[in-house]
């Protein structure tokens, strides 16, 4: 292969730029041309493709977001859209494509492989919800952003003796809520993977109050429902002043942590190596701190498994 391309798709995550940088520089190391596809699959169908030099990825390792931009595309989900994407790649004489994104992005990459075009996936999402990899690019940065926010909210919760409910992202996965809750010492954590009824939460709050605790932090993953509804229920049952903070898209932004920069660099370079080895229809991952690659079909068929031992630990430490 003499020409490769890279695109970012779906929700942005801190570290995507580091992965793009690694892919471009690894390709140049192997004397292979690298092209950037701008605006995800939507841009791919339009032919928004430009060659990337070593200088084009200078000073981006520390930047959040993605210099290639990202967009969701309904048109790409169609047979005609996918065929148009392949035609654009071949028109530019590109022989392999690296897709950085989440499970939806990988399904798109798999469609291209089915049409005879080699693709490799790199997991980039703050949700950490991709099977077959311990971590995804952006999770560590988002985790640190959430913990920092919780620490600040706890200051005001303590000052006003209030209960605060903080809603974090994650779609149907509770990793971000769970890890942040443990790291920030939350009194209760609500995630999709572990049922916890309101009576249990209120009893734990009452138990803390009996020990002299005058404020509480509850972390709610967006996949379990609205934080506002839980706040209303707690106020109704206890009469306590309860506030809600929805952290929102602040969790996606910011300069990536050293951990995310390292992970993205390793994964981006590995994706290039896999294509040059003649591999395709695979996803790069990290397991036990070792870079691995797994079949797309295997990764997409499995369900992400949250480590419930962390949840049990958080419950025992929040008494």
From Swiss-Prot:
Allosterically activated by ADP and other diphosphonucleosides, and allosterically inhibited by phosphoenolpyruvate. It is found in: Cytoplasm. PROSITE patterns: PHOSPHOFRUCTOKINASE. GO terms for biological process: canonical glycolysis; fructose 1,6-bisphosphate metabolic process; fructose 6-phosphate metabolic process. The active site is at 127 (proton acceptor). GO terms for cellular component: 6-phosphofructokinase complex. It comes from Brevibacillus brevis (strain 47 / JCM 6285 / NBRC 100599). It catalyses: beta-D-fructose 6-phosphate + ATP = beta-D-fructose 1,6-bisphosphate + ADP + H(+). The gene is pfkA. It comes from the Bacteria. Its EC number is 2.7.1.11. Coiled coil: none annotated. Its cofactor is Mg(2+). Substrate binds at residues 125-127, 162, 169-171, 222, 243, 249-252. One of its GO terms (molecular function) is 6-phosphofructokinase activity. ATP binds at residues 11, 72-73, 102-105. InterPro entries: ATP_PFK, ATP_PFK_prok-type, PFKA_ATP_prok, Phosphofructokinase_CS, Phosphofructokinase_dom, PKF_sf. This is ATP-dependent 6-phosphofructokinase.
């Amino acid at each position: 292969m003499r020409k490769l391309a890279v695109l970012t798709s779906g929700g942005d995550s801190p570290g995507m730029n580091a992965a793009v940088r690694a892919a471009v520089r690894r390709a140049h190391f192997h004397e292979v041309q690298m092209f950037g596809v701008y605006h995800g699959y939507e841009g791919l169908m339009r032919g928004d493709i430009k060659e990337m030099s070593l200088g084009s990825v200078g000073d981006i390792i520390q930047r959040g977001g993605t210099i290639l931009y990202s967009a969701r595309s309904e048109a790409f989900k169609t047979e005609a859209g996918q065929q148009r994407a392949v035609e654009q790649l071949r028109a530019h004489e590109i022989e392999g494509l690296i897709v950085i994104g989440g499970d939806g992005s990988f399904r798109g990459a798999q469609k291209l492989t089915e049409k005879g075009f080699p693709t490799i996936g790199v997991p980039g999402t703050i949700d950490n919800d991709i099977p077959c990899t311990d971590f995804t690019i952006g999770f560590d940065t988002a985790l640190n952003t959430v913990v920092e926010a919780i620490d600040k909210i706890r200051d005001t919760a303590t000052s006003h003796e209030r209960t605060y409910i903080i809603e974090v992202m994650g779609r149907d996965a509770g990793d971000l809520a769970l890890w942040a809750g443990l790291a920030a010492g939350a009194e209760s954590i609500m995630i999709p993977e572990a049922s916890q009824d309101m009576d249990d939460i209120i009893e734990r709050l009452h138990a803390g109050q009996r020990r002299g605790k005058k404020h509480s932090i509850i972390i709610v993953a967006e996949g379990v429902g609205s934080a506002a509804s839980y706040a209303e229920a707690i106020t109704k049952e206890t009469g306590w002043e309860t506030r809600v903070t929805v952290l929102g898209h602040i969790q996606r932004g910011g300069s990536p942590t050293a951990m995310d920069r390292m992970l993205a660099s390793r994964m981006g370079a590995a994706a290039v190596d896999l294509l040059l080895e003649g591999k395709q229809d695979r996803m790069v991952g990290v397991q036990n701190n070792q870079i691995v690659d797994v079949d797309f079909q295997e990764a997409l068929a499995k369900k992400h498994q949250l480590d419930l031992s962390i949840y049990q630990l958080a419950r025992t430490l929040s008494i």
